[in-house]
Amino acid sequence: MTGPTILPEAIYDELRARIIDQSYAPGESITESAVAERFDVARPTAKMAIERLVAEGILRREAHRAARVPQLDAADVVDLFDNRAIVESAAVAKLATEGILPAAAIAANRAIAASKNFASHDIAFHRALVAGQPSPRLAKLHDALMGEIELCIGQVQAAHLLTAAEVSEQHQGILDAILAGDAARASQLSNEHIAGSRDRLATSINKDIAESI
């Protein structure tokens, strides 16, 4: 008697969560055969989940090589977060101007305050802000960045660079500025929040490199 069928979506979800929470370390390979064995599925099913993660930037695959969790250096982090800041500051300014306060962002921030493992809720908060503003093109730009950004958010949590309380408090400031209709303040707080995470993570990565030499 065989067990229940596991759909590619479920495999994708679990792999994604385990990569974000650093259960799979940066640089670690994730092969189709290992995934197929772990989930007791055919290799084509495992491949579907892996290829989806590659398309999102959560995994990288070179030609004829196994997929690997990206190893981002400090320059990668700075580049990603600086571009993210451009998109997210524009998004929160639009929300404030339009008088839109996404309920999903409020719910995600409440979940952060109630959780030690807050990376998934942190990700949900930022995705909800950008998804809630009226420009679909801005949302597409954000989505293109978020795969690698989510890896970074997972690293921030794993290295204890920010506490859930600190993240939630900074998010609440952004929400309050949006609610007040203060586009400039919302944009400023968004930039400060992203820059703080960027600087802590880049410093942590450089420290790890220096200690390994």
Model-derived features: where do they sit?
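Alpha-helix N-cap/helix-start motif at coil-to-helix transitions, marked by capping-box chemistry
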Residues: 6-9, 81-85, 140-143, 161, ...
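Short phosphate-engaging motifs
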Residues: 76, 87, 137-138, 197
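Short linear motifs at protein or domain termini
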Residues: 1-97, 203-213
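Conserved amphipathic alpha-helical segments that form helical-bundle/coiled-coil interaction surfaces
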Residues: 100-159, 167-177, 185-196
